[in-house]
Amino acid sequence: MEITNPILTGFNPDPSLCRQGEDYYIATSTFEWFPGVRIYHSRDLKNWSLVSTPLDRVSMLDMKGNPDSGGIWAPCLSYADGKFWLLYTDVKIVDSPWKNGRNFLVTAPSIEGPWSEPIPMGNGGFDPSLFHDDDGRKYYIYRPWGPRHHSNPHNTIVLQAFDPQTGTLSPERKTLFTGTPLCYTEGAHLYRHAGWYYLMAAEGGTSYEHAVVVLRSKNIDGPYELHPDVTMMTSWHLPENPLQKSGHGSLLQTHTGEWYMAYLTSRPLRLPGVPLLASGGRGYCPLGRETGIARIEWRDGWPYVEGGKHAQLTVKGPQVAEQPAAVPGNWRDDFDASSLDPELQTLRIPFDDTLGSLTARPGFLRLYGNDSLNSTFTQSTVARRWQHFAFRAETRMEFSPVHFQQSAGLTCYYNSKNWSYCFVDYEEGQGRTIKVIQLDHNVPSWPLHEQPIPVPEHAESVWLRVDVDTLVYRYSYSFDGETWHTVPVTYEAWKLSDDYIGGRGFFTGAFVGLHCEDISGDGCYADFDYFTYEPV
């Protein structure tokens, strides 16, 4: 069996790999998207399906007002003592010496739940993980953060003992690692194998310099020695490699005795005419940071990536029978169920009566007008990941605005300051019109402002679609679902990426979704009949 990378396409970063018997799970970060954390299941490490979105209550995750790329950073999923343990950080600040990250622990007897109410685990850092030692003791490992550490690029990894009976941490903190010159040490996990403790961590930052480092010690407190190759995995030295930004590893031994590591990676789009080593030459990644897997071999007591330390497109699978799962492809939601499809997420807050309803008009998603796409508070946006470089997304909408501050339509969204929006609104003297708007680094543009597209008075519905074609995308509209007209504006798909947006705290990926806003306060709504996503 051969595994093709990435194994989780689209925005699925910071994988935490976990095994229960012959079942395998990966938990990934969701940042400001709700519900928090996505957990995937596999029986063969090749075919994965989404089985749980555990942080689905405000009591577990309150992100209203969180900044872009705040929220859930680097969860850690483990299985011990007959239950699953999930650690996570809710980051409240991303662009200062303080993160104000709040760390929590929840548990469940089954991956589907029910998940417990959260136990606070301190606010002193991020990327926490839990290590279950062979003697039953448990340890909490994390990256501390504050003004002192922010100014020191050689960041530290700290360990504290954890008492599961009382849910408390020992006040004694032990420093395990102070980093290498790669800097930005984070995402640490502890393992025990063949009499050694192994500390695995990410370094180099979250972009193209990203890497995995490994250390080992005979004692959990250290001292730890660094891997002979320093970096166990990185793609930094191979700018032409199709899988870039590889790092943030999570190690696992299969029930057949084989070793694998999940890691995050990205597939860049390179712009024509830009030299590979020039600024921007490595490319742009609108699909965000995805999840890959590597096969691991042991030599002289150290783990190595088979085939070399770079991320590889194909990997030999474990010695198990392949268990095919649904392949990400054509997707459709007709909104006939009583809850949103698991592929759909909202921004920062749960889908409830404030945002919309699936029962007010059966067979339709009703979205109530709330804040604009620029908001970080109450926003009626329901969206799904881009998982392909070329796809078509489409919807049919019924919407009757009566004020220019009311709109509804289709959006391609990266964060609150970078998105485009094709929508129906209301113009005095004209009635309903179709427009597009783009927000680029928080700078708006309205290319159809002087000549909006009129919606015929008799049109009960407006169909909207977006066609993404690798580097560019375009919106279209129809008034009968058969005859389509292209909006005469072309947008750059590559701009909806970490790489274009830059700076600190931009770690997600492009989404496509439905949106309704009403800043007039009059309480308008839009009804969406279906939402489709089709790779092309």
From Swiss-Prot:
Q: What is its EC number?
A: 3.2.1.37
Annotated InterPro entries: ConA-like_dom_sf, GH43_C2, Glyco_hydro_43, Glyco_hydro_beta-prop_sf, Glycosyl_Hydrlase_43
Short name of one Pfam family: Glyco_hydro_43
Q: Please give the catalytic activity noted in the UniProt record.
A: Hydrolysis of (1->4)-beta-D-xylans, to remove successive D-xylose residues from the non-reducing termini
The cross-references to Gene3D superfamilies, in alphabetical order and at most eight, read: 2.60.120.200, Glycosyl hydrolase domain, family 43
Enumerate the Gene Ontology biological process terms: xylan catabolic process
Classification via SUPFAM superfamilies: Arabinanase/levansucrase/invertase, Concanavalin A-like lectins/glucanases
> Which is one GO molecular function term here?
xylan 1,4-beta-xylosidase activity
What would be the name of the gene that encodes this protein? yagH
Residues the record marks as site: Important for catalytic activity, responsible for pKa modulation of the active site Glu and correct orientation of both the proton donor and substrate: D127
Family of this protein: Belongs to the glycosyl hydrolase 43 family.
- Active site, renumbered: D14, E186
What's in the keyword line of the UniProt record?
Answer: Carbohydrate metabolism, Glycosidase, Hydrolase, Multifunctional enzyme, Polysaccharide degradation, Xylan degradation
> Cross-referenced PANTHER family, in alphabetical order?
BETA-XYLOSIDASE (PTHR42812), BETA-XYLOSIDASE-RELATED (PTHR42812:SF12)
What protein name is recorded for this chain?
Answer: Putative beta-xylosidase
- What species is this protein from? Escherichia coli (strain K12)
